[in-house]
Amino acid sequence: MAERLAILGGQPIRTIPFLNRKTMGTNEIEAATRVINSEILSGFLAAPGSFFNGGKEVKAFEKSWAEKYGFKHAISVNSWTSGLMVAVGAVGIKPGDEVICSPYSMSASATAALFYGGIPVFADLDPETFCLDPKSIEEKITSKTKAIIVVHLFGGPADMDSIMKIAKPRGIKVIEDCAQAPGVFYKNKAIGAIGD
């Protein structure tokens, strides 16, 4: 191999530095402390209705998140994995459906599709963003492709314009995984509000 690795003085592939930012401030720490100190982590009362869907702090958080980012609804879940499971189920993935996903992500990107009997298909990444490369997405599409799971990484968004131009005309659903880029905007629109 003639080229040297970047770590050994060779030319780096990536030219844009990763964002290095603090993700939790005083308000978030105070809110979490308030809930923990109340000893009421959920409104669940073992009764029918929406009581299981979190306590008043959870409801307030969901409402403020939806308002802040322009979503019609915001529903909190216990983990990133659970969020992907809900999203993949919501778009109707069935056994044999192909779901294009990132090879550079937590395993839940692929296993959420597998849970519903879907087949994960890995597309290549854009070397600048480490998000899915739209050209590679297009190359991976078959008649069985039903969804694309876009993982926004390192506080930066994927190329959503190109991805939506590929997906929409074909009726392919786009699921945005924003766990590693919360509160990020793409061309003045909150990520998570662009796909399906």
Specify the residue positions occupied by each region the protein language model found.
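Short glycine/proline- and charge-enriched loop/turn segments
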Residues: 11-15, 118, 192-193
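Residues that recognize and position ribonucleotide moieties
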Residues: 22, 130, 192
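Active-site phosphate/pyrophosphate- and oxyanion-stabilizing loops and adjacent acidic/basic residues
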Residues: 63, 161, 189
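Structured loop/turn residues at beta-strand edges in well-structured enzyme cores
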Residues: 69, 94, 143, 193-196
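PLP-dependent aminotransferase-like
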Residues: 89-178, 185
